[in-house]
Regions:
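Metal-cofactor-binding active-site regions of metalloenzymes
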Residues: 2-275
Length: 275
């Protein structure tokens, strides 16, 4: 039987093994979309435990735990200990077999911490303690882990109203061998006109852009101004969470009317939203 998580894990033939070991493995990581928190990278955050690193904000793991019947307090609760949360994740992991979460968990244990044991309730305490001990070492800081994986560049997910201060300060002070961290333009909130919080968001945009927004054209001008600000601070790409492309016909006057309704907090019709 083939060993799980060996050096040729998911590399099922010689061509795949050659391409990975002799080519891809030597290349740097350039990540166009990540969920890293800019403040943690900028401050070279030191993780207090494997729970903070793994479960501090991973909604994929939380979803699996909820599906496994784990109480919400062990996912996002503030009154449970790091060990209690990790223990519940360890209870869930065996049930994620054949899900990428199972692969990721054990690949990370092996490649970051040198741990080849399978995570389960029986091994949870041992793995928890070993990971936490290693996290005290400088090379396990946020940037240290990025360097370990040969990360050359990450693009974070940033809203047009973000001030990008972490990116700006990081760019000023980063060492030559530190990975690049640049913002990516994620304007979903400006597009979601049907959202109840849309008007409040437009007011935030108005404040940070310095553009008084009374009509749709003003919002476009404000977004252009923020887009220029992002570009001036290294942004090279947009990152959109679009589930469906709309192709309804519209006129400029209709768009202005729809925008005014949304700003008054009035409910839009399906057609108006799609326009």
């Amino acid at each position: 039987m083939k060993q799980f998580n060996d050096k040729n894990f998911v590399l099922d033939n010689e061509v795949a093994q050659d391409l990975f070991h002799n080519h891809a493995a030597k290349m740097p990581i350039i990540d166009y979309h990540c969920h890293l928190i800019p403040e943690m990278v900028a401050n070279d955050h030191r993780f207090k435990s494997i729970t903070e690193l793994w479960l501090g904000g991973d909604h994929y793991k939380w979803r699996a735990m909820r599906t496994n019947g784990i109480d919400e307090k062990y996912c996002t609760g503030k009154d449970t200990t790091d060990w209690e949360k990790f223990e519940k994740w360890a209870e869930t992991v065996p049930y994620t077999l054949r899900n990428p979460l199972y692969h990721w968990t054990h690949l990370e244990l092996k490649t970051a911490f040198g741990i080849e044991k399978l995570l389960s309730p029986k091994t949870a305490r041992e793995i928890f303690d070993e990971c936490n001990e290693k996290l005290q070492q400088p090379e396990f800081s946020a940037r240290g882990l990025m360097k370990h994986y040969h990360v050359e560049c990450v693009c974070t997910t940033d809203d047009p109203v973000d001030d990008l201060h972490n990116h700006i300060e990081y760019a000023k002070h980063k060492a030559q061998d530190d990975p690049m961290m640049i913002p990516a333009w994620r304007p979903d909130k400006a597009m979601n006109i049907e959202a109840p919080e849309f008007a409040d968001y437009v007011r935030q945009l108005e404040q940070v852009s310095g553009v008084t927004i009374t009509k749709f054209a003003d919002m476009v001008d404000a977004l252009k101004k923020r887009h220029d600000f992002f570009a001036a601070n290294g942004c090279k790409l947009s990152d959109h969470g679009i589930e469906e492309f709309y192709d309804e016909e519209y006129t400029d006057s209709q768009i202005e009317t729809i925008f005014e309704k949304a700003m008054r907090g009035q409910q839009l019709s399906v057609l108006e939203t799609r326009q």
